[in-house]
Every structure is written in C-alpha cells, then in structure tokens.
Amino acid sequence: SPSETGTVMLSLPQDVQSESFNFPCDLFKKKIWKIQRQRADKDIIKKAIEWIKKSKKPLIIAGGGIHYSEATEELKKFVDITNIPVAETFAGKGALKYNDSHQLGAIGVTGTFGAVKISKESDLIIGIGTRYSDFTTSSKTAFQNKNVKFININNNEFDAAKNGALMVQGDAKAILKE
C-alpha cells in the first residue's frame, strides 16, 4: 500500500547488469491502483473537531500522505476555514503553495524559523499523512508545550497512534472532506 512505502535499494552484480533479457510485454502494461478511501469513525472526528475548536495555538504538519491521498485541495479548503498554519515535512513539500498565507515551510531539523517556533509553542499538532520521523520532530524536541496534544490523520495504524495521539485512522482526502 502507498502508506507503507519506504526506501528501496536494488543491488545487482555487475555481470547481471550487463545481461539482456526478453521481458514479456505484460510487464510494461499500465497498472492503475484504485485507492480505497477509508473513512474514520464519526465519533473520533467529532472529538477531533472539539479539540481543534478548544485549541489556542494549533499547527498542521502536512506529510507525504497528503500527496498519496491527492488531498492538497482539501487541505487548502480546511486551512482556509480553520485558519490553522501549516508546516510541511520533506515528503509533504508542496502540500500548500509556497505563497499561501498559512504556509510556514519546512519543519524539523532543517525547518524554517517560523515553523520551528510555532511547533515549540503549539498546544495541538494535527499530523496529516506524516510518520513523525526524527528529521521532522527534531528527535521530539520540536514540540515543547507541556500540554501539547496530537491528532493524527493517517491510513497507517502505527503512524496514527504515534505520540499518544487521537487516532483518526483513514484516508486524508476523505477525512478532510468531512
């Protein structure tokens, strides 16, 4: 599944690299992945909305899952309604246009001043399609508010549960539409 993709390295011996092979034509046929847009539990979505409404300094962290889900338009609509700033992971670059008023830029080890400052002060982190890698979280030093809570929107159960979050497990596009 695209939510479980990761780094791949193929190491082939030099003699294998120089060989030719008659590949069957079927190997090159176009394949289309149909993504099932898993929806989250309605009660969990209601709870997430309550947390967002009560939050004084929320921050959205947009990860690569935004792109896998094709949810950039839904993210834009969501931030226009909620007025929540957005920081992007390396894989989430381009989730919002660079000149969007909600755009803070990169977060984490090589993050922008604004994104890093706001992540330290935020009382609510809304992770959408992020794995919260050490590069993104600056080894967890990015979130310094002692009362910070997390809402994680992610197809992958493991990533949705990180940081003791309110797990909103499902497809980012489907969830942001709700």
Residue ranges and their predicted role:
Residues 11, 83-90, 151-154:
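Short internal beta-strands
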Residues 25-27, 71-83, 140-145, 166-167:
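Short, solvent-exposed amphipathic alpha-helical segments in soluble enzyme
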Residues 12-18, 64-66, 157:
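Glycine-rich beta-alpha junction loops
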Residues 34-37, 61-65, 166-167:
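Flexible, glycine/proline-enriched loop segments at strand-loop-helix junctions
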Residues 20-23, 71-72, 99, 163:
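Short, well-ordered secondary-structure micro-motifs
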Residues 1-54:
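Conformationally flexible catalytic loops at phosphate/diphosphate-handling active centers
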Residues 40, 47-125:
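Anionic-ligand anchoring segments at beta-strand to alpha-helix junctions in alpha/beta enzyme folds, i.e.
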Residues 92-178:
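Glycine-rich, acidic loop regions that bind phosphate or pyrophosphate groups
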